[in-house]
C-alpha cells in the first residue's frame, strides 16, 4: 500500500517539517508514504474572481500532473464528507478490501482546488467547515491517517 500527500506550496517553517517527519516515521511501519509539493502560483492580494480561477487552474494542472492514473484520489475540501477517526479508518479499510492500494490525498492552495482536480477526486473529505493553513492541514491529515492505521490494527492510541 502507498499513500501520497500531494500539496500546493512548500513547507518553510522548521516546526512543520519536524512534525511531518515524525508522522512519516510513524507511518513507515504501516505503509509507504510520500509527500509531493507543487509550487503555489504567485498571486496579488486583491484578485478578481477571474484571477483566482486562473491561479487555481495553474495549480490544478500541476497537481493533476502528479496523480497516477491508478491512484484513488481523496481531496480535502470544506464541502467534503466529515468523518470521525473511526469513520476514516473504516473508509480506508473498505477501499483496501476492494483492492485499492494507492491513495493520493490532495491539499489545495490558499484559493482552494480547481474544478478539474475536484472532478478527478474519488472522495471528498472535510476535517472542518473552518479554513486551516495548508501547512497545518498536512500535519492534521498525517496524524489522522496514522490514527486510522492504529484503529484498523486494533492498536492502542486513538483514545
UniProtKB/Swiss-Prot annotation:
GO terms for molecular function: rRNA (pseudouridine-N3-)-methyltransferase activity. It catalyses: pseudouridine(1915) in 23S rRNA + S-adenosyl-L-methionine = N(3)-methylpseudouridine(1915) in 23S rRNA + S-adenosyl-L-homocysteine + H(+). S-adenosyl-L-methionine binds at residues 76, 108, 127-132. SUPFAM superfamilies: alpha/beta knot. GO terms for cellular component: cytoplasm. It comes from the Bacteria. It is found in: Cytoplasm. Pfam families: SPOUT_MTase. Its main location: cytoplasm. Coiled coil: none annotated. Its EC number is 2.1.1.177. Keywords: Cytoplasm, Methyltransferase, rRNA processing, S-adenosyl-L-methionine, Transferase. PANTHER family: METHYLTRANSFERASE (PTHR33603), RIBOSOMAL RNA LARGE SUBUNIT METHYLTRANSFERASE H (PTHR33603:SF1). Homodimer. Specifically methylates the pseudouridine at position 1915 (m3Psi1915) in 23S rRNA. This is Ribosomal RNA large subunit methyltransferase H. It comes from Staphylococcus carnosus (strain TM300).
